Amino acid sequence: MLQTLKNAWKIPELRKKLLFTLFILLIYRLGSVIPVPFIDVTTLANYFDSVLSSTILGLYNAMSGSAFSRATVLALGIQPYINASIIIQLLTVAIPALERLAKDGGEDGKKKIERITRYTTVGLGLLMGWAYYMMLHNYSSQGYSIITTDGFLPALVIVLAFTAGSALVMWLGEQITEFGIGNGISMILFANIISSIPGMIGTLVTLVWWQIIIVLVGIVALVLFIVFINDAERRIPIQYAKRVVGRKVYGGQNTNLPIKVAMSGVMPVIFAQSICSLPATICAFTGKTSGWWYDHVWSSSSWVYAVIYFIMIFFFSWFYSTIQYDTVEISNNLKSNGGFIPGFRPGKPTADFIQKVINKIIVFGSVYLGIVALLPIIAGNLMEGVKNLAIGGTSVIIVVGVALETVKALEAQMLMRHYKGFLD
């Protein structure tokens, strides 16, 4: 990985992209320390110190790079964009017009879907900004005095500041995707989690020595396991029939169709977490973080939450896999190019076989993601001190996954540059 970064730095084009990505992330981090007006940051910090470790807000805070607990302009982070992406992608399957736009619209259709996602992000940012303001207002009425000035105008300024921040995060992510390295939103999320590590270390050192050893060994084992699964793939053998065109013979070679075990990446975990944490987030925003339903169903440390979380991960893994792999299209492409899978006729039998393989991989990949994501919940229920750690299986999956994807993107661009040099 370090060697890849070193080699990429020597290439002027990639060096510019790396510097641009770092520049955008720097802008994001600067925005993460600019507080919105009419909020007492000191009182807010005292309040969050008492609730972050015991509610879902601690996870939100880690995902936002601690901007959430400081009520900064970028406090909402990437959450509105992620929720908007979930809504639009589900509607794309449910509404035929959107499905046609996504599949048959080409580049224009893709741009229209992106534009709809942007508008939805702003709408959700406005809604979540209002919810965050109401949470601060509710706790201000309980004696915390977080909001320094009451009234319609201060409320409007606070909500619009949060909304503008969510739109800015979306725009920064798009700039990284277009002009930088890797997926912009993933890079921002990666930077947020990395920036939360010092605070996690501070919490870690408060544990008993044997708990520290277990946590460190667990994280290392988790990283190695994630790296192994990310590189694992099922290869379906493909043969091409020989074709004679004039005096030349084409085809006849053997190749394979690689299907990655972790084909859907980290998105099922991120989406499942957004959906499952919604009730607990509403409870946290309204201040109702107690009671039977919250403790036994909505709380992220409950077993019911763990089961629902696992089911949602399985659903989104299947959902993303169906979007990524159109087995009928793959079968038709093989048939038109003279390719076939040994033992299966071209057409429907080939499509059915590929779908059968993908279904098996989806089950394994979903179980893998579910186990990794649920390990922190299980560890937190077995060891009380570990529950206060903001880092979890989701965070480790995101950090490792984004790092591997970034390295692969750099390697692909370096390889492309070598091909360009050869052709030139």
Give the residues covered by each predicted segment.
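N-terminal cationic and glycine-rich segments that engage phosphates or anionic surfaces
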Residues: 1-424
